[in-house]
C-alpha cells in the first residue's frame, strides 16, 4: 500500500495523482534527457534524493539488516523518490524509504517462492 492511501480510493483519484507525479518528473528531468525517476544515474540520485539525518539513519539500518548492495540502495532511493512524488512531497521521508524497502523485500520473497 502506498503511504497515505485509503482502501477503496477511486481509480480516477489515483490516476490523477500518477499523472501529476509523471508531470513533476518530466519537469525535474527536462534538461537531463530522461523522463522518470527510474532512469536516474548516480549524479541525479545525489541531486534529487538527498536524505536528512533521520532518513540516513533509516537507510543505514536497512543496509545493515537487509545487506543491501549499492544497486539495491539506488533502487530503494528511486522508489522512495517516486512515492514522495505521488504524495507531492518535496522531500523523501523515512516512511517512504521503509515502504520502498518493503517492496524490495516482497520482490525477493516472490523470487524465492516462485522463482
Feature annotation, model-predicted:
Residues 1-113:
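Basic, amphipathic alpha-helical bundle interface domains used for macromolecular binding and assembly
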Amino acid at each position: 500500500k502506498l503511504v497515505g492511501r485509503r482502501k477503496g480510493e477511486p481509480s480516477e483519484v489515483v490516476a490523477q495523482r500518477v499523472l501529476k507525479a509523471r508531470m513533476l518528473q518530466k519537469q525535474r528531468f527536462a534538461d537531463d534527457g530522461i523522463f522518470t525517476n527510474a532512469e536516474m544515474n548516480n549524479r541525479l540520485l545525489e541531486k534529487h534524493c538527498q536524505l536528512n539525518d533521520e532518513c540516513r539513519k533509516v537507510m543505514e539500518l536497512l543496509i545493515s539488516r537487509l545487506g543491501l548492495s549499492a544497486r539495491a540502495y539506488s533502487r530503494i532511493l528511486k522508489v522512495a523518490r517516486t512515492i514522495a512524488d505521488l504524495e507531492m512531497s518535496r522531500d523523501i521521508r523515512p516512511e517512504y524509504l521503509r515502504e520502498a524497502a518493503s517492496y524490495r523485500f516482497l520482490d525477493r520473497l516472490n523470487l524465492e517462492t516462485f522463482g
